[in-house]
Amino acid sequence: MKKRRKVTSNLEKIHLGYHKDSSEGNVAVECDQVTYTHSAGRPTPEALHCYQELPPSPDQRKLLSSLQYNKNLLKYLNDDRQKQPSFCDLLIIVEGKEFSAHKVVVAVGSSYFHACLSKNPSTDVVTLDHVTHSVFQHLLEFLYTSEFFVYKYEIPLVLEAAKFLDIIDAVKLLNNENVAPFHSELTEKSSPEETLNELTGRLSNNHQCKFCSRHFCYKKSLENHLAKTHRSLLLGKKHGLKMLERSFSARRSKRNRKCPVKFDDTSDDEQESGDGSDNLNQENFDKEKSDRNDSEDPGSEYNAEEDELEEEMSDEYSDIEEQSEKDHNDAEEEPEAGDSVGNVHEGLTPVVIQNSNKKILQCPKCDKTFDRIGKYESHTRVHTGEKPFECDICHQRYSTKSNLTVHRKKHSNETEFHKKEHKCPYCNKLHASKKTLAKHVKRFHPENAQEFISIKKTKSESWKCDICKKSFTRRPHLEEHMILHSQDKPFKCTYCEEHFKSRFARLKHQEKFHLGPFPCDICGRQFNDTGNLKRHIECTHGGKRKWTCFICGKSVRERTTLKEHLRIHSGEKPHLCSICGQSFRHGSSYRLHLRVHHDDKRYECDECGKTFIRHDHLTKHKKIHSGEKAHQCEECGKCFGRRDHLTVHYKSVHLGEKVWQKYKATFHQCDVCKKIFKGKSSLEMHFRTHSGEKPYKCQICNQSFRIKKTLTKHLVIHSDARPFNCQHCNATFKRKDKLKYHIDHVHEIKSPDDPLSTSEEKLVSLPVEYSSDDKIFQTETKQYMDQPKVYQSEAKTMLQNVSAEVCVPVTLVPVQMPDTPSDLVRHTTTLPPSSHEILSPQPQSTDYPRAADLAFLEKYTLTPQPANIVHPVRPEQMLDPREQSYLGTLLGLDSTTGVQNISTNEHHS
């Protein structure tokens, strides 16, 4: 029997990117008692041949796993849900706030979501009612990051919500079961500065110096290190000897340059202990701290054209020092250089130089010149070490009074005392700001000023992000920028519990939700943030129009406005509708267009219930109900409610253009009864007659109506108000149509300015196309032309069918009231036998224009309305003799007085 090959039975687990054992560089495999090795990177041909001879066996398989893939997968999913567009397929709404998520993530992490999505797999939106949005945000971030970043007082709320949503892992974590404590993350997440330090400590030191093998977090730090420490090796041997000789001079012999501890990759045993090392480490730490304190806006970038020596050096301490020195010098009445020199130390007598009628004092020690004796005497104390000014609190002495003034502010609470953190690289003197340090180098080390400037220039070069390649002028800005590429949100809002990745995002949030709105003092317009307010004031009220079109010369206030204006010349319409293919020049026009497809008519008229897509359309429509006619024709004085109507009127009447042919109405036909309507809303309102839908319900009597306007009129019944008063008598009415009926039939007054009746309105506003081959519109036009005959024949037929016993109220007169003189009472007339002669209409003019032209001209021109259309009394409108009291009420008469209906027989008798 063939000897069975022996293979290592244990499965080797190889972690990608990590060594199992630093001592194991090879993997050994035994085959036919012959052990051979091959490098982990590339096996030998003999090994491959041996493996090929082995029969398939599970023991020969190797398990390859990546420890980073799990975290990376969650990271990719978390980054994806924060992008637009993303692969998220679920929208979770909590307290009106929307959260995008992936169904698979929330379903796996929460049994609540698993049950909801299993029951309704096609659900795209889930609304939570028992959880606050701030607590749910913590839970959602836990599902994507497996971490909580909460305050201690928030833990009970998050734990309760986790139990409600059945997120088991979160419940265990918050109960501290089988997990490590949160340490400071649960209790104290102190300041953004500490978070930046932690973030910096987590960065890998992947930049190594080739001269001293030290590691740095940033490439820029390495460049600064080379410029400072190994500058001689970079500039050449000759210049290098000079730099080395200078670097190891007596002043700097005790200083051993070392990187800060958090950037140094060496062990603690290798770090040298001593005053020089400690001082340097403290210096670098203080310098970094000063850089952080100087930075105010993480996204701001400094102008490269600023002076290298004064860049970022403005400091409150230096300003106080300069101001104090200025005040001190101004307060002292110093004699000029030509006057007698006071008490000057022996050997420091100044050299007097006569220069253009002005004497200058020159120091014999340092050749520095002064124009006043007081300044020179103060300068001599630098060489003598004399300090005549003493602090009365701590008894510390100073050489100048200005320095003592600055020192005294340390004991008071007037201003914050700034520590001197900036050390001169040539004499180790400390300064409070970079500005005073730069002045010190130019004054006392002029031979090293050029080198100092070159170092500053190297430092001022941009710091670049390795991920997005964005550049910054300062390292603290880059460190804050790196937070954007992580999951940290160290900046907490002082007004709520929201956290943000940057100070700028936090500021925008505070201005929008807590501090705003910010009104303009000039026009009163409100803005969400101060930036938009400032831009509005500059551009709108400041008269700035700095953006000019190079094609037509038009000037605009905003760059975005100019960009959109240029599309007029180029014809570019970048916003394409994916539904209908229509393109738009502006994004706002495209968003308004989308409402057409989504039937998003969010603006509703309060009077008639008609809905509109745009607010300006609703504003124009409301003028129909208000009767406002603010646009007047300058030629004839006719007023219109809309400006476009005035334009059409002016062009058609006064200019003679046939503008109305451009305005052809859109018609909608009912599928049930084939009636045609002008507007879509009118068709929808009509269709309710077939469907029986009555969406408008009275809350008092539960009666329903098809039209909102009918409900509005109905609500007057439930109130005691009678807002419509008759101008000719004391009668009041609840409805306007009742008042009009009363005026027409009781007082027999009809104003020529009254709006058309219902029948007239139907005739005039009948929409008709102008094409002669359209049968539908020709038929409607013919109906309009024959309409007077229809009324006449209808009246005759109606009266012929009326029974002789029914009295027809042809002429209605007021009944004598108690206060009315008898001689003013009119006699009533009765209906003679030939009733058709009484209702015979007046002769009609047959030379009507076309119906469409009539409808248009009556709307936009001066053509009078036809007022001679007869309104016959229909049988269903006739009153029963027993209901005479209702007619009296309708006409505004006294309820106790009936209306006299005299029959024909009574008249003959």
UniProtKB/Swiss-Prot annotation:
Q: Which PROSITE patterns match?
A: BTB, ZINC_FINGER_C2H2_1, ZINC_FINGER_C2H2_2
A GO biological-process term = regulation of transcription by RNA polymerase II
Q: Does the keyword Zinc apply?
A: yes
| One annotated Gene Ontology cellular component of this protein | nucleus
Chief site of localization:
nucleus
- Compositional bias of type Basic and acidic residues: which residue ranges? 284-295
- The keyword NAD appears for this protein: no
The entry's keywords: DNA-binding, Metal-binding, Nucleus, Repeat, Transcription, Transcription regulation, Zinc, Zinc-finger
> Where in this protein does the record put region Disordered?
252-344
Gene Ontology molecular-function annotations: DNA-binding transcription factor activity, RNA polymerase II-specific; RNA polymerase II cis-regulatory region sequence-specific DNA binding; zinc ion binding
- What domain of life? Eukaryota
Q: Where in the cell is it found?
A: Nucleus
Give residue spans, biased composition: Acidic residues.
266-275, 296-322
Q: Where are the zinc fingers (C2H2-type)?
A: 207-230, 361-383, 389-411, 422-445, 463-485, 491-514, 518-541, 547-569, 575-597, 603-625, 631-654, 668-690, 696-718, 724-747
BTB domain location is 88-152
Q: Which InterPro entries match?
A: BTB/POZ_dom, SKP1/BTB/POZ_sf, Znf_C2H2_sf, Znf_C2H2_type
**Pfam families (UniProt xref):** BTB, zf-C2H2
Described by its record, this protein's role is as follows: May be involved in transcriptional regulation.
| PANTHER family xrefs | C2H2-TYPE DOMAIN-CONTAINING PROTEIN, KRAB AND ZINC FINGER DOMAIN-CONTAINING
Q: What is this protein called?
A: Zinc finger and BTB domain-containing protein 41
Which gene carries the instructions for this protein? ZBTB41
